[in-house]
Amino acid sequence: MANSKNSKTSGKAASKPRAPPKKASKLLMRIRKAKIKDKAIFEIPHYPQSDEFTSSAASAMMVLKFLNQDFKFRKESEYSIWQESVNGSVWHGSKYGLAYALAKRGAKIGILSNTKDEGYDKRLAVYENVNLDTLAASFNEIKQKAADLGIEEEHGVVTVQAIKKALSANTLPIVLIDANAINSYLESSPHWVVVKGYDKDGFYINDPYSDSTITMDPNAFKLAIGFESNMHMIIADAKAFDAKKAKESK
């Protein structure tokens, strides 16, 4: 028989202590607090993708070359980065895979995204006859690898204002867009580009499918951002580079 004193005191279940709220990384916090400048432009070199599915890798290479002048533009590097970035996605490169490939090579990375799961990749997987369980396992694996490298993610919508804030905070945005919205002769598909800057005339974009930097009106660029309502932006700190990690990744 239960002790009556204990019964009274235990009638109300003890509440579990709440975990402290997760603090945003210094990189993401810096962007959040940044004041938008009149213009912000970085001299990021252009690199054209070698295949129709390697825009993620080509975009990563442009950022890596900006951060590390010793980094070489080579097809071998492009396909190596693509193999890592494609983990958790179908062909084009996942946000976690791309972030992981960059961080592994010395970049300091953050992610802004409005989705928490595989998103449109589930539909593409069915179209490409990729097993959904395999896709989910790959997605979760690369997500954990990204977390292990200290990559943090903020849930939010990628807008032209968010991109301006990122650039104003001295970070380099790699943004997911719809290929058809930026190249009318291409089919609608997920495509990654590097936004090197903006001024009163518009945004300057290193599109790996093009031969050089292109300029886009803010309203036109706004319509291009994201694919099937999924929005991802990989953010690299323009002033941080870990040479030791870069050397170890070779």
Where in the sequence are the language-model features?
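Noncatalytic regulatory segments and standalone regulatory/sensor domains
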Residues: 18-32, 86, 167-168, 174, ...
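Short amphipathic alpha-helical segments and helix-helix/interface helices
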Residues: 98-99, 160-164, 193, 222
